[in-house]
């Protein structure tokens, strides 16, 4: 059996390891979040002139866009990072959690169709399932499309195609009559490409959601 001294030493080492893990994970997330925000500065004016930024812990950055441009009446960006500061980070990855950029917009008109295109293996996709009416139909594919009608399914196909043309990998693409009307959850964009391309694509997708 371990002596009380050895047990104390072991507990001390474990505590230091946990603190070191927390510090390293926090630093990594803060660095990633700030780097992505710097990258977005070039393209942000395409959707709004000013932004209010809040860090919610070390894993979430909320960016509220002030005075958003048409077709948005309000818009929010969320940088959702993996919990690298927590010891169970590997388990969260097994459950499909990945660094994700989320754009949520309230549109100036209510969409005429409702749909959810989801990656069911992702955190975003599983989180959305409980919000989908059971009466909706499902079409399987690389993204599972939940839709209320044939026009909604057609709209989903057009949105997914446009998103992929823009280099996006959506885990969730949502068009709803309730607010927020429009959402897209994507893997963090490639910062080697211009940020304007990302925000131009978001603008086009929101316009397409209203057609």
Predicted regions and their residues:
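Short, strongly hydrophobic alpha-helical membrane anchors
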Residues: 1-4
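Single-pass alpha-helical transmembrane signal-anchor segments
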Residues: 6-24
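Residue-level detector of solvent-exposed, low-hydrophobicity positions
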Residues: 7, 46, 130, 143, ...
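N-terminal topogenic membrane-targeting module
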Residues: 24-97
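Residues that form generic nucleotide/phosphate-binding pockets
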Residues: 40-43, 159-162, 205
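Structured extramembrane domains adjacent to transmembrane segments
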Residues: 71-197
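Short amphipathic C-terminal alpha-helix that caps PH/PH-like domains
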Residues: 195-210
